[in-house]
Amino acid sequence: MERSPGEGPSPSPTDQPSAPSDPTGQPPAAHAKPDPGSGGQPAGPGAAGEALAVLTSFGKRLLVLIPVYLAGAVGLSVGFVLFGLALYLGWRRVRDEKERSLRAARQLLDDEEQLTAKTLYMSHRELPAWVSFPDVEKAEWLNKIVAQVWPFLGQYMEKLLAETVAPAVRGSNPHLQTFTFTRVELGEKPLRIIGVKVHPGQRKEQILLDLNISYVGDVQIDVEVKKYFCKAGVKGMQLHGVLRVILEPLIGDLPIVGAVSMFFIRRPTLDINWTGMTNLLDIPGLSSLSDTMIMDSIAAFLVLPNRLLVPLVPDLQDVAQLRSPLPRGIIRIHLLAARGLTSKDKYVKGLIEGKSDPYALVRLGTQTFCSRVIDEELNPQWGETYEVMVHEVPGQEIEVEVFDKDPDKDDFLGRMKLDVGKVLQAGVLDDWFPLQGGQGQVHLRLEWLSLLSDAEKLEQVLQWNQGVSSRPEPPSAAILVVYLDRAQDLPLKKGNKEPNPMVQLSIQDVTQESKAVYSTNCPVWEEAFRFFLQDPQSQELDVQVKDDSRALTLGALTLPLARLLTAPELILDQWFQLSSSGPNSRLYMKLVMRILYLDSSEICFPTVPGCPGAWDVDSENPQRGSSVDAPPRPCHTTPDSQFGTEHVLRIHVLEAQDLIAKDRFLGGLVKGKSDPYVKLKLAGRSFRSHVVREDLNPRWNEVFEVIVTSVPGQELEVEVFDKDLDKDDFLGRCKVSLTTVLNSGFLDEWLTLEDVPSGRLHLRLERLTPRPTAAELEEVLQVNSLIQTQKSAELAAALLSIYMERAEDLPLRKGTKHPSPYATLTVGDTSHKTKTVSQTSAPVWDESASFLIRKPHTENLELQVRGEGTGVLGSLSLPLSELLVADQLCLDRWFTLNSGQGQVLLRAQLGILVSQHSGVEAHSHSYSHSSSSLSEEPELSGGPPHVTSSAPELRQRLTHVDSSLEAPAGPLGQVKLTVWYYSEERKLVSIVHGCRALRQNGRDPPDPYVSLLLLPDKNRGTKRKTSQKKRTLSPEFNERFEWELPLDEAQRRKLDVSVKSNPSFMSRERELLGKVQLDLAETDLSQGVARWYDLMDDKDKGSS
């Protein structure tokens, strides 16, 4: 049977191949059978698609050639074709960059953690510039709420645009009568809040929140003007920035918050992906212009000083002031100079390197200033001054960018940023700041001007400003804030038409305009305007109310600002009658003036004679205040409020009980004890006691001291270990809150050891607060000698606080190069090194250090200023005895370095550590003769000892005894002793303080020492002696000796004290200068009082 040519072969059922398994999991029905009419050849699934793709590609290339053909047809040159090609390539590049940035941002939000780890090594072009890791609290709970609400917010936006915005656009212009929104979708990517940071408000009635917001959305909004077949839209958007939300005022009624203010502290980052006709906005040049215009529109109502206010309660007072509050202060920025800038100009195709033509842009929020251009200079001197209003601290930043001026495009030379909070804290900040993104430094002097609400210091400010060299504008003495509220009964236009009033406010040559309010003669503006005033006594505010055409004047007002100077708190809040207007036309305004005052308490002005660093002033033209040409040098330091607020914590590690036995002998068959010691950690310091051998109830009786601050959350960590040859065994730990000790001042407790079955530790903690008076120093030294333990370091009697602010006129390296100086402060064996300030002979350190002082009369502060790699630039030795005679024990001034070149400004402040719970009384209570006030229980009965008297009583006894010590000494002189019984260690303690008026037998003074013997024993076990002093009749020893014996046995002994001298190097004989014998049974061992004892003669010469 013949087949027609159109028929294909008919395969038999056995010849038909089985359907292959679909790897994609599609059902068998998806595989279509061949069409009988297809000639027997099954069409491939992508055949039609491939053909369509080829045709589309061919069509695109043909469309590209059409403009070329048309250009040739109309006789245009090839330059037009090349220009169009360049325009297209630029547009394509901008589009690709936007799409790549949008994809990277979306992918980052989809898998934030994993992608961040991968993109750490990406180039800066691939990783979005806004990606940061702010030190804020996460707010995932808030993001979940936003994600849930996002679809409903999209529905609201669709209704808002279709029902409100679209009719308004159609009514605004006859050509837009067919304007409509064809598509409104917010997409599936909601706004994300990266973190929230809460700041303490300036007032108690406000709460400040910073929201780090990031929106990388797939929003799609399309519009169409059907009459002109015009389509446009947005497909994708990025918005990143810090939105500050202020809840203010807080009220006593629901909803608790009266209003919410929102604004961006700095301009946010915005990137829009256009579609349709708005694709033209991605053309290079138009792209940056359109982005700038959009950002300017956003900044006009949502970037400082503008803010969005949402009242939450009706009839809220001072809405205008909430919408535009007074500035926190004014910063006067002196842009002085720059140095070491990069050379950007090239000549002869780059073969010859030129210099740069630098200028600077200074920004704070929306306030921007541009300096003049300095031609061909890498170390320009500008000497310009700008004044900016600061609205939010912290948050706002001063930004300075330096550019090289070129005919085509200016080259970037570097930038610096500084938080205004540092200027507020310093008051005056004068420094060289390094430029980031380039090289070199810029010299700024920043002055924080406070706002005063009275005119008392206006004359002083005006006098200061006369000496300020300021350009391009003279310095301001005050600011004026005008709150323009509303007007009433303005005159109508011709034909009794309602006017469209707006207001022009002018002070000298500065004019600002309000918005226009349409079709009303009773407009409400609620706007604020700010002016700088050079001389409020002579300036005037000129107000013109006009129609929006500016041709018709509806009213005028001229107000001398001198009226404000006599008003309460420099405020006028009232109606003002308009002239050249209707009979009842008036304007309601609130005017607030504030005087700009630079706190001069820390600044030396030339009117102060003899101040180091004051200017040389011409008597005919005295300069007052701060000057760019001759900036004042401070006479005193300006430390922060935390300087000098440290305390000293004295830690007595007394004893422990019931510790765990860790030692084992004979392979663990024999159980031993432990060799315990204590480790303490606090404020970054660690201490360790001595080891007590084989004792489960050890006594350490050691004292440690550490400098602490009142920062909350600190803890004293105590751990007990058993000392072993290999690894020390853990015996327990405990913690004590430092805040508890600082608040109570004293803590004496048995603390249970944690993480072990048994054991407890006895600690005594005492807070010592420095006092700026030397009257109690001798008593403090006396008390310290009484409570000093043999195995502890000498106790501190004072705390020295040093604030190193700055240095000036340091010597240069090799005569021409600036050093990189740092300072080292040393007292005894403790040192502190400041930071290194790069390449300057006038470094500013602003650092503080504290030292424990044991002997203020004899110790010195050693200061060395060194250069990194250059050695010593200068040194200073300050005896602390000078502080003891200074007012408030403080020296705050410039000190000249010993090198003769250079000075340092520092503050040295001494505080005497007076103990309120000395511990001497606690030691002595168990054996006082006044039994009526004492506890009968032994000291180790399980609780802390009962303190029966206080340190002031001890000091009173010491003062009383010292007052009677001026009796004349006997013929052989006197020896000063303190004898008492230390009950906690069960020891008899004697302190040999010194001798006076000793006998001189020969031509030369003796070399005295003191020998002590505890009778009736005369063996070496009870014998003690001091060191020997050379050639003196009044030696000072201050040495402590101990004998371990019970109290009842000590009261049966006699203490034999002999003062001897070694007259000859070769002789073993010792000359007895005098002796005294104390019957301890007749001595009050509970008092611990230092006394002078007359030395007696003894015919028998003793030998060592």
From Swiss-Prot:
The keyword Membrane applies. Residues 1-38, 84-1104 are cytoplasmic. The modification N-acetylmethionine is found at residue 1. Ca(2+) 2 binds at residues 345, 357, 404, 406. Disulfide bonds: none annotated. Residues 1018-1025 are annotated as: Required for phosphatidylinositol 4,5-bisphosphate-dependent location at the cell membrane. Residues 925-946 have a biased composition (Low complexity). It is a multi-pass membrane protein; Peripheral membrane protein. Residues 312-433, 460-580, 627-751, 777-899, 971-1093 form the C2 domain. The chain crosses the membrane at residues 39-59, 63-83. Ca(2+) 3 binds at residues 406, 408, 410. It comes from the Eukaryota. The modification Phosphothreonine is found at residue 948. Its main location: endoplasmic reticulum. Keywords: Acetylation, Calcium, Cell membrane, Coiled coil, Endoplasmic reticulum, Lipid transport, Lipid-binding, Membrane, Metal-binding, Phosphoprotein, Repeat, Transmembrane, Transmembrane helix, Transport. SUPFAM superfamilies: C2 domain (Calcium/lipid-binding domain, CaLB). CDD domains: C2A_C2C_Synaptotagmin_like, C2B_Synaptotagmin-like, C2C_KIAA1228, SMP_ESyt1. GO terms for biological process: endoplasmic reticulum-plasma membrane tethering; intermembrane lipid transfer. Interacts with ESYT2 and ESYT3. Interacts with ADGRD1; inhibiting the G-protein-coupled receptor activity of ADGRD1. Interaction with ADGRD1 is abolished when cytosolic calcium increases, relieving ADGRD1 G-protein-coupled receptor activity. Interacts (phosphorylated form) with SLC2A4. Anchored to the endoplasmic reticulum membrane by a transmembrane hairpin structure; both N-terminus and C-terminus are cytoplasmic. The C2 domains mediate lipid and calcium binding. The N-terminal C2 domain binds calcium ions and is important for calcium-dependent lipid binding and interaction with membranes. Two calcium ions are bound at a high-affinity site and a third calcium ion is bound with lower affinity. May bind up to four calcium ions. In contrast, the second C2 domain apparently does not bind calcium. The third C2 domain mediates interaction with membranes enriched in phosphatidylinositol 4,5-bisphosphate and is required for translocation to the cell membrane in response to increased cytosolic calcium levels. This is Extended synaptotagmin-1.
